[in-house]
Amino acid sequence: MRIGIIAEFNPLHSGHKYLIDQAKNIIENNGGGEIVCVMSEFFTQRGEVAIVDGYIRAAEAVRAGCDMVIALPYLASVAYSDDFAKKSIEILSNSGITHLIFGTEDTSIETFEEIYNKQQNITEEQYRELLKQGYNFATINSKILGLQNDVPNFILAYSYYKNIRKYAPHIKLLPIKREGQGLNKEEVEDKQFLSATAIRKNINNSVVTNYLSKEMIVNIRASKILLEEDFFDLIKYKILSLGKAGLKNIYDVNEGLENRIYDMANIATDYQELVNSISTKRYSKKKIQRILLHILTNTTKADYNEFFGTKVFRVLAAKEDKASIIREINNQSNITLVPVLNSKTSGYFVHDIKVSRIYNLKAQQEDIFRKNIILIK
């Protein structure tokens, strides 16, 4: 048995530990096996910055019970839920997982099936009509399929179901009832589990430390904590220097959106003002946050189109006695796992190296992209 986890661990907290413990219990009750995780590194699916770098978060995941953590490349990390799920599942399927465990508000496989069957009957005309009315795809899916925008874990869970059904039907789903706060909740409440958002927003609140391990608290305090606002000056500079013509080449900038982005950047004085001023009914704040990251990292439409053929991925951390999994996967699958960059492998990661340097510029740390795999006893 090999259980997969798709995660951001931004940061890893008691709710994530609960999920990992559930996976460990299942493995122990079924004769043994491994937990393999694929994790976003520098930025997240909602267009947010990782609070600390990927190596710190991956090492924490291994200490919490994962056997290996593979880095999800930038272009999949900051993607729509379907593309995020598709690439993550491709990596995990090739890593030999038999099961995928995840937290969700609704654990009923029948619910996923019902939504999937509805989606098969939706015509392009229905989508186009709602797009003409100015709705974004998330809202359209909410209207047509009943997917609720305010339960992002369920939306991702459905994306996992859909992509596994299509590309890796041998993988069995292990949905676990999500406990505690919703993902988007920012305030600190008296709950067993806090949301990652609440922890990031209240990281200096002593109550928050109850939801983190001692190692994670030490690492966070030793690091420069990054927030989206830290990148505002670079984003604004990039928008103004690219101009409207240059913005057209950036991935996901379509339908004249470059004009709105450029005009709002000229007057915005902080990151949140920029996001709020660009977003509309058609363009959600999350979509705008992702686009701003693509502008920051100069991610073009060509970059995105080329990326999804990528078959080489980095391993950030692993248990010392499980490192042999890397060789097993490389010998038996269609992907290659790289524990350290060298002259032969660095060419596969040109875009991610650029992303890491932008992140490190604000984190004020060395080029952590070139660190070796972290092995933990």
Question: What is each stretch, according to the model?
Answer:
Residues A59-P73:
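A glycine-rich helix N-cap at a beta->alpha junction
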Residues A71-K377:
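Active-site cores that bind ATP or allylic diphosphates and position pyrophosphate for catalysis
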Residues K24, A58-V62, K162-R165, R200:
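Class I S-adenosyl-L-methionine
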Residues E28, V62, I89-S93:
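Non-catalytic positions within long, well-ordered alpha-helices that form the structural scaffold/packing
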Residues M1-R57:
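N-terminal catalytic cores of NTP/NDP-binding nucleotidyl/phosphoryl-transfer enzymes
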Residues G33, D67, T98:
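Short acidic/polar active-site loop segments enriched in Thr and Asp
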